[in-house]
Amino acid sequence: EGVAVNDELTLVIDIGKSHAKLLMVDAQGTVVERHGRANASVPSALGYPALDVQGLEDWMAQTLRASSHTARCRRVITSTHGAALVALGDEGLAWAPVDYEFDGLAQHPLLASAFDAAADGFAYTLSPDLPAGLNAARQLFYVQNLHPEAWRRTRCLLPYAQYWAWR
């Protein structure tokens, strides 16, 4: 027994820096159900601020289990910050996702200089030299150099939006 096409909903997962939302939207664009929660970084086991993946996942699972509309959702659309990414290992997260506003390299001037020397310029990347972790390469360089064991566990990198669609 399926859901009639005109009864189908799209689940929108919108994860912002300070707030996360789950919306269930019908074919006409009407929001049928809306849920939200505060969102903030959490301390990681490696000592840097991390995106709250577990808190968000627990909230989403609880919210979707409690909704009478979940069975009607046939599509998922995710929206997150473009600099957020997740590293997967053989058994889930390889390391907690670095908060993209964390400037880990600023705490290590020699490492920051090494990054600046190694990074390709705008003409090659078409990305300006953004501060903190707003260039994902800064986050990756930070983990590679300060947490090499965590980096070795990395098998795959996913943009944050794709992680939530996959999850």
Task: Give names to the regions the model predicted.
Residues 2-96, 153:
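N-terminal glycine/serine-rich phosphate-binding loop of ATP-dependent small-molecule kinases
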